[in-house]
Amino acid sequence: MDSGSRYPGAFIHRTALVEADSIGEGTRVWAFCNLLPGSRIGRNCQICDRVFIETGAVLGDNVTVKCGASIWNGITLEDGVFVGPGVAFTNDPHPRSGSHLAEYPRTLVKEWASLGAGAIVLPGVRIGRYAMIGAGAVVTADIEDFALVVGNPGRRIGWVCVCGEQLIDAGDVLGCRAGCRRSYRRSEGGIALAGGSADPRSA
């Protein structure tokens, strides 16, 4: 099917089952996706094949969710988040078959963070802006802005630029390995952008 009158300006593949409360203009929902009532999707998102989005999930603008990922109740993805194929979010710390929580823990993925293929995110964590979660990593605790995280349990092994490349640590000032002209300074609890664009789509 095309976007239809319910979601003007969006594209919905004819095999997708879509009952979301809202889908923004320019968003594309591909084959065999299931978007439940009570979910909300922003503008210009890419929801790839076989993605499941549950009631209560919220996606901002320009979000990409690759094939086979599941986004559950209590999970919010801010603008520009990238979710790799097969990423598994969880929303119940002590699950039992047939039991349901009155309120699910809130998991927040901040703007432009990226989660690599097969990463697992445990309930109630906050993943910071521009953070990069490596493929297969298990996120068990909050992650700082710009952190590069790998392993099980996930641990920070460095910092990444707005553009996604790893930063070169030169003391108080850090620079991008790719030479994108952004610079960073150390701040309490992590690093902060000191110069250059905060938009990954620009140099």
Q: Which positions does each model-derived feature cover?
A:
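Cysteine-rich micro-motifs
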Residues: D172-S183
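Short, intrinsically disordered, charge-biased short linear motifs at domain edges
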Residues: D145-N152, V160-G171
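Flexible, active-site-adjacent loop/turn segments at secondary-structure boundaries
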Residues: V87, R155-G158, E165, I191
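Short, low-complexity, intrinsically disordered N-terminal peptides in bacterial proteins
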Residues: M1-P8, S197-A203
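Short metal-binding segments enriched for Cys and/or His
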Residues: R182-D199
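Structural signal for interior beta-strand "rungs" in well-ordered beta-sheet cores
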Residues: S5-V150, G154-R156
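Intrinsically disordered, low-complexity terminal tails/loops enriched in metal-binding residues
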Residues: V173, E188, R201-A203
